[in-house]
A protein has these predicted regions:
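Terminal connector regions
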Residues: 459-527
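Glycoside hydrolase catalytic-domain context in secreted enzymes
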Residues: 1-466, 474-483, 488, 532-1003
Length: 1003
């Protein structure tokens, strides 16, 4: 009997275990359903397509994935060739003859940055800098093999390189690569330690100086390649550096007892973020196949520790974090005390004030090695204004014609830059001495050839913002000077030119009356949708005082002012700066209660789930955002459907088959497709980083690059992979500090250059069907503490609007795409038509806070981006909102968010029933669908079409698993029943036998 009982227990245990196992699998699958749909999607079925229409809206050029990859690699090479920037070329050291014999020095010549910190040696099809040179020149294989045997640069180069020194006599030239890399969560170090005498991570290191010294002593000519998105201190390249002797002996400023022979360094080229084909591009430039035409996108300061941002970059923690709504009792902050004076805006203004004897102790030449916009060529160019520029009063726009002439002996491309100087009154609105107004790049010009390029400058982009007094944009009266420049410092030369020469390079316009962009006479700025007034008083402006109002460490930020640069120079936080005491800030970090009356201003329940129209999403392609047709279409969605689309936006945006909405897939990143569970085939993972794109100063090329991204998505589909619709890029944050960990994802220190390039690149990508989630809005200029409860970013509203928001403004206002869509003719027949629509299709918000409020729920989203700029794109979070912490999903929804970068259900969205919640759910869903309708996900889907999907394979496997387990459990149950039945029978028999035995004993 015990054996049978044991069998029942065993079988019951097995059956129970199988049920528990399958239940666990079911729960896990339910939680990860979106990810499983990414990996194992069902097939799309399109039905009811109207009138035999094919729905081929996008004209793709590629016919295969291989063709798309080749196109992408060619575009990457072209971008690098136009963006790499020649910064030094003494004695015409470059170009080199193709017969030059080259020794390549530096481990990172073969392990350079393509974009961020990726190593090309680990990427199929990539050409490292070293490999590119080896493909072009005869290179020293002994040295190459030596570096192949190690995994870093040599601490003592001489001790290692002496082993192959016997080969040097055959080689005249050494090419040395210096690299810096950073990445997400990884800023450049402000101090790399005592062993390096506490120099920064962007200062040349001891072993690098030793390597350059070794190269100078063993080769006739040394070429330096700078492979870094972060601006390094490059004083060692400057013969006029205070630490450089006349004969090229350099004294290390961090170790004054050490000197190095750098006399043979004759040329240097910036090659940061050069993409998968950067090696080929570099080799083509070095031998003159390509004439370099890139220009620097940042100012190269001689000593970064003296930059205005240096004292307020890094880790600063509130001492009363435990009192706040803080994860692990940690809340951090960053103070943008420098205000508008970022990059060249500081250095050029400081130079002017010093020249006027208003800034003692500042010397431009000892502060700046290479100015913003600087770049050399193998030829020379002359620029001059051609005719008088025009000013369009209605559109408040200047139009310039610039004649660019190749005055040298080889073909090349020239860049014209125009900087605007606005009138400044001491003590008035802060103004940089010059700001970039516009730029243009020529075609390839032969020697002696000229081209006239058009440069348009919108007044809106250099108008000042007065956050203190008028609390709006202000155009002061006075003289406005437009400098036709080679770089940001050209104004200093032009001011001293003869009248004849000055007329070629300087245009001045007098504005007799100030414009206050809120009064009845002036109204809003021309490009704005509504009047712009202070939106950030509670989040930002309250935190700022004048430099002489109070004392350092009083808990406020003291404005850096041109009126007294020296005494107002930024300082590090101290004292009460580390205490969050203001009630406005405390309210912003407090837990958000979605049920408070103030958070539910809408009382009338919006329409949902109405009788269906005949519209599907294909009918909405090409329909303007404000068209009433959208109201009819949106009213037919259920709340559940809208919640699903809003809450599941992580790499996989959900479908609504009933309303003709297909599912779509999104991918990282700004420089190539990164999988995240998507089916990505053999793509060009590493395009050039955004700084390299910006360095081309070529918006036409940027648009072609965006188109190439779209072609690759289509190519991936042709190969059986995912059709990518959304990309988490490009990057529009500002190079506030050289130490920013993600500078490789962002274009520049200048918002006009960044905004123009982003608008062009997004326009190209969107025309090929992509939704570009430009990231990270806003103030994500450092990585330190970014994900630790989101650091609080404090910047006054003037700097926020003029520096950190302007790139986004230009992207929203200027990015355009031409789409194809079906319209009806006079007979009611569908005809394919063309239309220009906004290409600012998406934005990704940030982890950090704007002020003390999470940036993903900032007042700036609705108040500035939508209300003022007219933004109609889809806004997605950077990762998901989190319940009861600072990334609050309900607040994000109410502030203009449209998607959460999660795929795990509602993820903290508590309110899905109130009128306010449903109103904003409809608004969010409309933004999602408006941009989907004009994307590649509609390719092949004509008006009237319905979309459905076969069941995902993983669900079939799950159901099959349940069937198998169910069958096994059923069999198990039968066996248990049989055993139990048999046991009962045996028991009955035993009882009967026992009973019979007793009778026999009694008789």
């Amino acid at each position: 009997m015990k054996r049978k009982t044991s069998k029942i227990v065993t079988l019951s245990t097995i059956g129970g275990a199988l049920l528990v196992l399958m239940t666990g699998v079911q729960i896990a699958a339910s939680i990860q359903s979106a990810n499983l749909d990414l990996l194992f999607p069902g097939d799309q079925i399109i039905t009811d397509s109207g009138e035999g229409l094919d729905g081929n809206y996008i004209n793709y050029e590629v016919k295969s994935q291989d063709e798309a990859l080749k196109k992408a690699q060619d575009m990457t090479q072209l971008t690098a060739e136009e963006g790499m920037t020649l910064i030094k070329n003494d004695d015409n050291a470059l170009p080199m003859a193709s017969t030059t014999k080259v020794t390549i020095l530096g481990y990172y010549s073969w392990h350079n940055n393509m974009s961020g910190g990726e190593d090309p040696s680990n990427t199929t099809g990539a050409i490292s800098l070293g490999k590119g040179l080896a493909n072009k020149f005869q290179t020293n294989e002994a040295v190459t093999n030596l570096y192949a045997s190690v995994n870093d640069d040599f601490a003592d180069p001489a001790s290692k390189l002496d082993t192959v020194k016997g080969t040097f006599s055959e080689y005249d030239t050494a090419v040395v690569t210096l690299k810096r890399n950073s990445g997400e969560g990884n800023d450049q170090s402000l101090d790399i330690g005592a062993s390096e005498n506490h120099r920064t991570g962007l200062t040349i290191k001891t072993n690098e100086l030793k390597l350059l010294d070794y190269a100078s002593k063993n080769f006739k000519k040394v070429i330096v390649v700078i492979n870094s998105a972060n601006t390094m201190e490059l004083g060692f390249l400057d013969p006029n550096d205070p630490n450089m002797s006349a004969d090229g002996i350099y004294t290390d400023p961090y170790n004054t007892g050490a000197t190095y022979d750098l006399s043979k360094i004759k040329a240097a080229i910036w090659a940061g973020c050069c993409g998968s084909q950067g090696g080929t591009a570099l080799a083509n430039i070095l031998d003159g196949t390509v004439n370099p035409s890139g220009h620097l996108v940042d100012t190269y300061a001689r000593d970064l520790t003296k930059d205005p941002t240096y004292k307020n970059f890094g880790s600063y923690k509130y001492s009363n974090s435990a009192e706040l709504n803080s994860y692990q009792d940690e809340t951090f902050f960053v103070e943008y005390e420098e205000g508008i004076y970022v990059g060249y805006r500081y250095y050029e203004t400081a130079a002017y004030e010093a020249d006027k004897e208003n800034y003692s102790g500042f010397n431009y030449d000892t502060s700046v090695v290479y100015p913003f916009g600087y770049g050399l060529s193998y030829t020379s160019f002359s620029n001059e204004y051609e005719g008088a520029p025009t000013y369009d009063e209605k559109n408040e726009t200047y139009s310039f014609k610039v004649k660019v002439t190749n005055t040298g002996s080889v073909a090349g491309k020239g860049v014209a830059q125009i900087y605007v100087n606005a009138p400044y009154t001491k003590g008035g609105i802060e103004k940089a001495h010059v700001v970039l107004g516009g730029f243009a790049k020529t075609k390839m010009l032969q020697p002696g050839e000229s081209e006239t390029v058009d440069i348009e400058i919108k007044e809106d982009y250099f108008t000042s913002y007065d956050y203190k007094n008028e609390k709006c944009y202000v155009m002061d009266s006075g003289y406005y000077n437009f400098y036709l420049s080679d770089d940001a410092h050209s104004w200093a030369t032009i001011d001293n030119e003869s009248d004849t020469e000055k007329a070629k390079h300087l245009y001045t316009r007098y504005v007799s009356e100030s414009k206050i962009y809120k009064d009845g006479k002036t109204g809003k700025r021309v490009t704005d949708k509504s009047v712009a007034t202070n939106k950030e008083d509670d989040e930002l402006n309250w935190k700022f005082k004048e430099y002489n109002e109070g004392s350092v460490g009083d808990g406020y930020i003291h404005n850096f002012t041109r009126a007294n640069f020296k005494d107002s120079f930024p300082t590090s936080p101290t004292g009460n700066d580390f205490v969050m005491s203001d009630e406005r800030a405390k309210k912003q970090v407090a837990k958000y209660n979605v049920w408070d009356e103030e958070n539910n201003p809408i009382t009338e329940m919006p329409e949902t789930n109405t009788d269906k129209t005949s519209y599907t999403l294909a009918d909405m392609r090409g329909v303007d955002y404000d068209d009433p047709k959208w109201d009819d279409y949106m009213n037919q969605f259920t709340v559940d459907s809208m919640v699903n689309m809003f809450s599941n936006g992580g790499w996989n945006e959900l479908e609504d088959a009933e309303n003709g909405v297909p599912k779509s897939f999104d991918a990282d990143s700004p420089y190539g497709y990164y999988a995240h569970a998507l089916d990505i085939k053999n793509v060009n993972k590493w395009y050039c980083g955004d700084p390299m794109v910006a360095a081309t100063f070529n918006t036409t090329l940027a648009k072609e690059l965006g188109e190439c991204f779209g072609e690759e998505s289509y190519g991936n589909k042709l190969a059986g992979g995912s059709l990518i619709t959304g990309i988490y890029g490009y990057g529009l944050n500002t190079h506030r500090s050289a130490f920013g960990g993600r500078n490789y994802e962002y274009y520049s220190e200048d918002p006009v250059l960044a905004g123009k390039m982003a608008a062009a690149e997004a326009g190209g990508a969107s025309e090929k069907g992509l939704v570009t989630f430009m990231k990270h809005y806003a103030l994500n200029e450092q990585e330190t503490n970014r994900q630790k409860n989101g650091y609080c970013s404090y910047v006054n509203e003037q700097a926020f609007r003029e520096v950190y928001n302007r790139g986004w403004e230009i992207y929203i206002k200027e990015a355009e795409m031409e789409i194809n869509y079906y319209n009806t003719d006079s007979n009611g027949k569908y005809v394919m038509s063309k239309k220009t629509m906004p290409a600012a299709t998406g934005i990704m918000t940030c982890y950090n806070r704007i002020g003390a409020r999470w940036g993903g729920a900032s007042d700036a989203l609705f108040g500035i981006l939508r209300d003022e700029f007219g933004y109609t794109g889809t806004t997605v979070t950077d990762a998901g909102g989190q319940p009861n912490t600072y990334m609050t999903t309900d607040l994000m929804l109410r502030k203009g968010g449209a998607l959460t970068l999660t795929n795990n259900g509602t993820n903290g969205l508590y309110d899905t029933e109130s009128a306010t919640a449903i109103y904003y759910l409809k608004d969010a869903t409309k933004h999602i669908l408006y941009n989907k309708a004009n994307s590649n996900i509609m390719q092949g889907i004509a008006p009237g079409a319905h979309v459905s999907y076969t069941i995902s394979p993983w669900k079939i496997w799950l159901y099959t698993g349940w069937g198998v387990i169910g069958g096994l459990v059923a069999i198990d149950a039968v066996f248990i029943a049989l055993i139990a039945f048999n046991k009962i029978k045996i028991k009955e028999k035993e009882v009967k036998v026992s009973a019979n035995g007793s009778d026999e004993e009694e008789f």
